[in-house]
């Protein structure tokens, strides 16, 4: 899990898993994970009353989106009528038919930081082309290419990480990605945008 990975790389820090607005407002950084479908995650976020707290936190606090958490940062998704958080311009697209490749894209794949993002603090100590673990049928398409922090090839070249100011997000799961994933979490804990 994300919390276990963070506890492993930052044993002196307190890691809290919470669905309380107060915890989000008091934290010094935030991880937005997600599981399932973006419309369901957005619906649960709105129903929980956390949406406003999350949007306020995203203005200034380091924020790391993971998988659906990355997708939720964008404006909309082909997955359903739900709107995203619109913290980044762009949309979430479904992989088309890519025979003989299977959808969902599941397993290890290489991640290539973009030239403009290669020196981003979250990539520190991670070699370009390192393997990370993916499980997804959708990918983000950023409207602003300067937000693309990495790409991956799976039938097409798709965006596998994005960044802007205090926000960084990955389509892959760092917590399932062995040493490279733990290093990314360690870098996030130290990141001071």
For each feature predicted by the language model, list its residue ranges:
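Proline-centered loop/turn at the N-terminus of a beta-strand
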Residues: 62-64, 131
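C-terminal and late-domain segments of enzyme folds
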Residues: 129, 139-193
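Gly/Ala-rich beta-loop-alpha elbow adjacent to hydrolase catalytic centers
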Residues: 65, 69
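Pocket-forming structural segment of enzyme catalytic cores
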Residues: 75-154
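N-terminal beta1-alpha1 cap of cysteine-dependent amidohydrolase-like domains
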Residues: 1-62, 78, 91-96, 100, ...
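Glycine-rich nucleotide phosphate-binding loop and flanking beta-alpha elements
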Residues: 37-39, 70-72, 139-141, 178
């Amino acid at each position: 899990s994300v919390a276990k990975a963070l506890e492993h790389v930052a044993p002196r820090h307190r890691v809290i898993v919470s669905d309380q607005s107060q915890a989000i407002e008091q934290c010094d950084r935030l991880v937005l994970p997600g599981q399932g479908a973006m419309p369901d995650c957005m619906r649960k976020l709105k129903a929980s009353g956390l949406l406003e707290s999350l949007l306020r936190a995203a203005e200034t606090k380091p924020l790391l989106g993971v998988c659906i958490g990355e997708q939720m940062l964008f404006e909309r998704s082909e997955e359903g009528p739900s709107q995203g958080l619109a913290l980044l311009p762009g949309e979430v697209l479904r992989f088309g038919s890519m025979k003989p490749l299977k959808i969902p894209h599941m397993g290890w794949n290489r991640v290539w930081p973009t030239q403009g993002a290669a020196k981003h603090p979250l990539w520190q100590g991670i070699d370009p082309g390192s393997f990370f673990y993916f499980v997804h049928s959708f990918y983000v398409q950023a409207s602003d290419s300067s937000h693309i922090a990495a790409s991956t090839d799976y039938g097409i070249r798709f965006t596998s990480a994005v960044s802007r100011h205090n926000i960084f997000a990955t389509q892959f799961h760092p917590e399932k990605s062995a040493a490279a994933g733990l290093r990314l979490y360690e870098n996030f804990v130290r990141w001071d945008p």
